[in-house]
Amino acid sequence: MNLPPPGIIWNSLPLPALMLDVNDRVIEINPAAELFLNLSARALKGQALGERLAISAPLEEIFARVRKNRSALFVNDVDLTTGERAPVQCNLQAAPIADDPETVLLLISPREIADRLGRASMVKSAARSAIGMAEMLAHEIKNPLAGIAGAAQLLSMGLSGEDLELTDLIVDETRRIVKLLEQVEQFGNVRPPEMKPVNIHDVLDRARKSAGVGFGAHMLIVEDYDPSLPPTLGDADQLTQVFLNLLKNASEAAKGQGTIRLRTFYDYALRLRRPDGGGQRLPLQVEVIDDGPGIPADIASSIFEPFVSGRENGTGLGLALVSKIISEHNGWISVESAPGRTLFRISLPVAPKEL
């Protein structure tokens, strides 16, 4: 079997990777690292790693031990920061190069994806059970609530003053609860997606226009698109709902006027590996970035789970629905958040050419 050239292997590595010389200066960086660090190879090459990245680990000591012992070294639970980006927890692996032991290979494994994949397999059945129970309760509770609202309306006919205000309050609150229960039922009854080749920019345009004349009228929505993106395979209506939900979250989180940036780009190296060992390339990237207050730290790790919300009157179903739809599209969604910047990234497959 003929092996591909080293350059192709290097460029195809799914993990961020860098090569450092004897002075710990960057001599090579692969495309996955450029994307993850949001820094170009031109900007990094020749630079001391510690000058461009903030890493909560003694890098000089780590690299010195690797060169001295001629063996790989693993460092877990490291916080890595570049520029204004929020810290990302990573695992690092440093190893010497066989033909040049003074050169060190550094692999970066972001913890977020690995942790979420592990959690997903454990909580999936529990979440499904919770949703099933919620659907059943919603159906059973709606009927008596309708009776309560009807009785309150009948009572109000012979009342006035403070007593009338109380019956009106009963009617308003029962309607609010019924609306919430209908959202729970809707979440559990999302139809399977009708998969067809979809231009993701058409989807984003529909969502942007709807937001601009409604809940997002006070926001500045900036488009930063790669016009060369190929179609994805998906359900245009459901994907529109995904981006409407993300735009709505960003708009509601903003204090007064804010800015939302819609960005698309192609990452040929991104591949999602599932717990069963399989995998799929997800090269189409869509980012929704806002300058709002960020996601509260105590719910950041569970923001895509049902009934988790950072807003006082939120149902906690919007992002759970987004995650569910993207999962059914064989895609992936992730989030980075800090005060002043929240980034949701959706990764999707390319539509087969024969369709």
UniProtKB/Swiss-Prot annotation:
Autophosphorylated. Its EC number is 2.7.13.3, 3.1.3.-. SUPFAM superfamilies: ATPase domain of HSP90 chaperone/DNA topoisomerase II/histidine kinase, Homodimeric domain of signal transducing histidine kinase, PYP-like sensor domain (PAS domain). PROSITE patterns: HIS_KIN. Residues 4-71 form the PAS domain. CDD domains: HATPase_Glnl-NtrB-like, HisKA, PAS. The modification Phosphohistidine is found at residue 139. It catalyses: ATP + protein L-histidine = ADP + protein N-phospho-L-histidine. It comes from the Bacteria. GO terms for molecular function: ATP binding; hydrolase activity; phosphorelay sensor kinase activity. Residues 136-352 form the Histidine kinase domain. Pfam families: HATPase_c, HisKA. The keyword Cytoplasm applies. Keywords: ATP-binding, Cytoplasm, Hydrolase, Kinase, Nitrogen fixation, Nucleotide-binding, Phosphoprotein, Transferase, Two-component regulatory system. One of its GO terms (cellular component) is cytoplasm. It is found in: Cytoplasm. Its main location: cytoplasm. One of its GO terms (biological process) is nitrogen fixation. InterPro entries: HATPase_C_sf, His_kinase_dom, HisK_dim/P_dom, HisK_dim/P_sf, PAS, PAS-like_dom_sf, Sig_transdc_His_kin-like_C. Member of the two-component regulatory system NtrB/NtrC, which controls expression of the nitrogen-regulated (ntr) genes in response to nitrogen limitation. Under conditions of nitrogen limitation, NtrB autophosphorylates and transfers the phosphoryl group to NtrC. In the presence of nitrogen, acts as a phosphatase that dephosphorylates and inactivates NtrC. This is Sensory histidine kinase/phosphatase NtrB.
